[in-house]
């Protein structure tokens, strides 16, 4: 995976929510662009979402690259919200990338920027613990302050 000359540590961490039912899907999302087509905005995460999405349908390939993909759907409402890169192709691995293989369509999810421990500053990816994804629904609740932002 090529992250040389690429830095993502200054990117904001987002809580990702399903646009259809408002379910929190991940607490460590990042705004990103599709490697094969940088005009396409999306969100991504590095840790598999727990108890919020599941695979749906069969694996597929796109005409843009040779990555093997599989759609993921929100467990609460059933809508397709993104896809998982099951097997990344060498072209994408050699491109400047953030190492994330869980992708969320910007038409299906929205992001809420997270605040750091002080509650004042935005939480940046470089300050995020490596294994933070939680499964406890109470900790995934979005505070009123974050909704207002």
UniProtKB/Swiss-Prot annotation:
Expressed at high levels in stomach and also in kidney and, at low levels, in heart (at protein level). In the stomach, highly expressed in foveolar cells, parietal cells and chief cells (at protein level). In kidney, expressed in endothelial cells, mesangial and epithelial cells (parietal and visceral epithelium) around glomerulus (at protein level). It comes from Mus musculus. InterPro entries: YPEH2ZP. The lineage of its organism: Eukaryota, Metazoa, Chordata, Craniata, Vertebrata. May play a role in the regulation of cellular reactive oxygen species metabolism. May participate in cell growth regulation. It is found in: Cytoplasm; Mitochondrion. This is Protein FAM72A. Interacts with UNG. Its main location: cytoplasm. Keywords: Cytoplasm, Mitochondrion. GO terms for biological process: positive regulation of apoptotic process. The keyword Acetylation does not apply. Coiled coil: none annotated. The gene is Fam72a. Disulfide bonds: none annotated. Belongs to the FAM72 family.
């Amino acid at each position: 995976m090529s992250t040389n000359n690429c830095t993502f540590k200054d990117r904001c961490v987002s809580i990702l929510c399903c646009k259809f039912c408002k379910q929190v899907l991940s607490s460590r999302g990042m705004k990103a662009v599709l490697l094969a087509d940088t005009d396409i905005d999306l969100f991504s995460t590095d840790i598999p979402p727990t108890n919020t999405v599941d695979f749906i349908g069969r694996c597929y390939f796109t005409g843009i690259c040779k990555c093997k993909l599989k759609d993921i759907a929100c467990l609460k409402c059933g809508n397709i919200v993104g896809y998982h890169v099951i097997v990344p192709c060498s072209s994408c691995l050699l491109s400047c990338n953030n190492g994330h293989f869980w992708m969320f369509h910007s038409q299906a999810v929205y992001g809420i920027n997270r605040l750091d421990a002080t509650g004042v500053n935005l939480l940046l990816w470089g300050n995020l613990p490596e294994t933070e994804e939680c499964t406890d629904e109470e900790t995934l609740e979005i505070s009123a302050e974050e909704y207002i932002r």
